[in-house]
């Protein structure tokens, strides 16, 4: 079960209700987490960081999965503010907090992908794929359990000249999303490139 925002409801109504709820009961760590997440959705990065750092400081905020999510949202906020070093540090904290979740590894892998740090992409996607039991909580995100880990690995392997391994990952990504035309195209291109290489080999 993947949790997504309800497209039939305007997000505009969520924020004032959450702010009011936190104002009325500042000891409710769950609502504080939700408020920080809503600030992230709105692009209010400083408010997100402030709110979720407060969430993490609360003695009642003990659920590791949710704490890791707060750390990931703080990391994304720093990333959007242009501070990759702080973003990296918060992603690593999220991994340490909940090493049983794929999402923190995948968030960091995506950041490293944008930075073209291919070895890092391969390491953290590999860590994510080593987690084979999918948690049944709202923290779990579909991307981390779909084609994305294999897709990023395909790109990283291709960029580092390992085309045969890239093809393996391209096929694995396509198996997760058979109707995706881009993934199908990746497989076709790599098969063609490898076929041409084999034909030109002495």
Task: Give, region by region, the residue ranges found by the protein language model.
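TPR-repeat structural position
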Residues: 11, 45-46, 84, 118, ...
